[in-house]
């Protein structure tokens, strides 16, 4: 029977991949690869727009956490915890507590069932936005509907005092703060 259990390791936000590599290197350099079966940083793809161009990037689903299937002993626990950018193991009374099977299954399901990229910015009905491109550039509008599949916003734009419905790509608008 395997003594490996899943643990959640808290990291500095944005350092999840660096911590993953550091843990992998730690077990390799010390010849204890058998104590680490798997290490996971759940991510999702998001669509961003930089300089008017669409870019797909990865975002951590659980910012600040790495999940590792470990045969954990006190020595390995302290070595991992002393790595740069590692906060602590999640647990009670300062002792690592393994994740429940239910919890890790929910996390792994998200890893294995990656969805299509989602826009990084979301819009809500009734929200005011500014149009940044196209014939209605610099107009303000109200979001009526959002079509996530097509990446379109249905907006109401006030033109010459009349409310006019228009469909615009979400990349052509920005939130008004």
Curated annotation (Swiss-Prot):
Q: Where is the KOW domain?
A: 125-150
Q: Specify whether Transcription is a keyword of the entry.
A: yes
Example of a GO biological process term: DNA-templated transcription termination
Top-level taxon: Bacteria
Q: What is this protein called?
A: Transcription termination/antitermination protein NusG
Database matches in InterPro entries: KOW, NGN, NGN-like_dom, NGN_dom_sf, NusG-like, Rib_uL2_dom2, Transcrpt_antiterm_NusG, Transcrpt_antiterm_NusG_bac_CS
* Key words of the record: Transcription, Transcription antitermination, Transcription regulation, Transcription termination
The SS bond pairs are none
Q: Which GO terms describe its cellular component?
A: cytosol
**Stretches of the chain forming a coiled coil according to its record:** none
Q: Which family does it belong to?
A: Belongs to the NusG family.
Organism of derivation: Campylobacter jejuni subsp. jejuni serotype O:2 (strain ATCC 700819 / NCTC 11168)
Task: Summarize the protein's role.
Answer: Participates in transcription elongation, termination and antitermination.
Q: Which Pfam families match?
A: NusG
């Amino acid at each position: 029977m395997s003594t490996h259990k899943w643990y959640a390791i808290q990291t500095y936000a944005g350092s999840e991949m660096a911590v993953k590599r550091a843990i992998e290197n730690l077990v390799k350099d010390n010849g204890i690869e058998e104590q680490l079966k798997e290490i996971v940083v759940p991510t999702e793809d998001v669509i961003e727009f930089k300089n008017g161009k669409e870019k797909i990037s990865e975002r951590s689903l659980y910012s600040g956490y790495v999940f590792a299937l470990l045969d954990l002993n006190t020595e390995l626990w302290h070595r991992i915890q002393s790595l740069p950018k590692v906060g602590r193991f999640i647990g009670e009374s300062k002792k690592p507590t393994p994740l429940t099977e239910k919890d890790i299954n929910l996390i792994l399901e998200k890893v294995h069932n990656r969805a299509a990229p989602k826009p990084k910015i979301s819009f809500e009905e009734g929200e005011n936005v500014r149009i940044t491109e196209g014939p209605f550039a610099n107009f303000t509008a109200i979001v009526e509907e959002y079509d996530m599949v097509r990446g379109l916003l249905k907006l109401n734009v006030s033109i010459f005092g009349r409310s006019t419905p228009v469909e615009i790509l979400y990349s052509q608008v920005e939130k008004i703060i």
